[in-house]
Amino acid sequence: MKTDIEIAQSVALKPIAEIVEQVGIGFDDIELYGKYKAKLSFDKIEAVKSQKVGKLILVTAINPTPAGEGKSTMSIGLADALNKIGKKTMIALREPSLGPVMGIKGGAAGGGYAQVLPMEDINLHFTGDMHAITTANNALSALLDNHIHQGNELDIDQRRVIWKRVVDLNDRALRQVIVGLGSPVNGIPREDGFDITVASEIMAILCLATDLSDLKKRLSNIVVAYSRNRKPIYVKDLKIEGALTLILKDTIKPNLVQTIYGTPALVHGGPFANIAHGCNSVLATSTALRLADYVVTEAGFGADLGAEKFLDIKTPNLPTSPDAIVIVATLRALKMHGGVSKEDLSQENVEAVKRGFTNLERHVNNMRQYGVPVVVAINQFTADTESEIATLKTLCSNIDVAVELASVWEDGADGGLELAQTVANVIETQSSNYKRLYNDEDTIEEKIKKIVTKIYGGNKVHFGPKAQIQLKEFSDNGWDKMPICMAKTQYSFSDNPNLLGAPTDFDITVREFVPKTGAGFIVALTGDVLTMPGLPKKPAALNMDVLEDGTAIGLF
């Protein structure tokens, strides 16, 4: 079979202006970036706010293998299949980060015959959103350091600057650096570091802002440092929120592209799901809901991370809550959770499927706690056997959850027709009674305890020495009513990536909190989660090249 990029390059794309006509978007409503990419105008976003809100489908997954379980591919294939059965559908996805694209993923725009296009553009520079976010983040760093250098009127303690620079690459050498070296004209020397762009609070802010004025307000509320008397220093204290908003004035507009089958797609924003909230922009999802009858969106990594954050952090900012949740599972991942080594995942092992099913079962039960109907989608691989598939279907039937096979990677929309029909039937016959896991008035400790005990299945929460000091500090600063964004490994319900399946006898330790007061949530750091990834021994970049005619190769 052709590679993903070969399939993508074989498709005759339609002009994006033609694609978006099917959802009522005219030529004057878009700002073109070439023939096949566009941004949606503010006027159109405002104009559709009075329109009826469609049905929202959230795609999530079980705890993944390192290769991922195909959420983006399944989301795209499901949207194409829904369109094929007569449902007016759009898709709302995150933008890929160039770091993982060049590192381990090699591309993140779906796969096989379920892709968003133009695939090369989306995976590389797209409409420049990542660069604008990087620029805004680093402009803040430059202006902050300049304030300290030019007299430090706010009495900023340079030992307590918490704002980091960013770059959209995996570069472990930049995790800890010292800036201002050389001479007094180079600024005040201090410790600093780089995060990857998608870990920037500005990315999270962009994805939660509801309009330009809300973006500016959120930017103004970013905490960047503390003064010598431990008072938080905000962007608004530096009086630079206007400049940062100016840099991002076009970035906030959602990007329009298409799938292989011509389904309109809004691809916008891309915060990490293990260290941020892991969902595409509120603006893109909200606008899609007013343009289409059905909207398919996804949340990063497993349901314990991305879906929990979608439901507890993003959903309160949307015009509606999910009408159905689709949990993507693969037999290889279930076998891994059942104790099979990575090298043996292609071998039939029905007993391992049974053992690993506990992971899927917990995710199903967790999503049901939110009052939303659940469907399981089995992302089919050629190594899957009839016995394994039959076993998984029986196990799903035993817990009364709808389940369908899907082969959208290989067969495109046709491979997702049964799944699409089942999802549509569930939405039409079962009501969603969404409720959050915790209340805003709960303390930070109470919110984390509910997440750990009700979603992860853990026993207790321990707070390290630094976290204990911060709990009082955050309460004194009035930050304790914000939602919690848990930063932990994506591979396990616990904070130990090697504890697979559905563990129960474990505790979670929160070592530190990070205030994301602009985004409007508090990050709780557990385990060894990194905000700047490193590259593997053989990065995907080694297989990438460009031919003399400009054709890209190696993007998987």
Curated annotation (Swiss-Prot):
Q: Note the InterPro entries from the entry.
A: Formate_THF_ligase, Formate_THF_ligase_CS, P-loop_NTPase
Q: In which pathway does it act?
A: One-carbon metabolism; tetrahydrofolate interconversion
The GO molecular function terms of this record are: ATP binding; formate-tetrahydrofolate ligase activity
Alphabetized UniProt keyword annotations: ATP-binding, Ligase, Nucleotide-binding, One-carbon metabolism
Q: Which domain of life is it from?
A: Bacteria
Q: Please give the CDD domains that the UniProt record associates with this protein.
A: FTHFS
- Reaction(s) the record says it catalyses: (6S)-5,6,7,8-tetrahydrofolate + formate + ATP = (6R)-10-formyltetrahydrofolate + ADP + phosphate
Name this protein carries in UniProt:
Formate--tetrahydrofolate ligase
Q: Which gene encodes it?
A: fhs
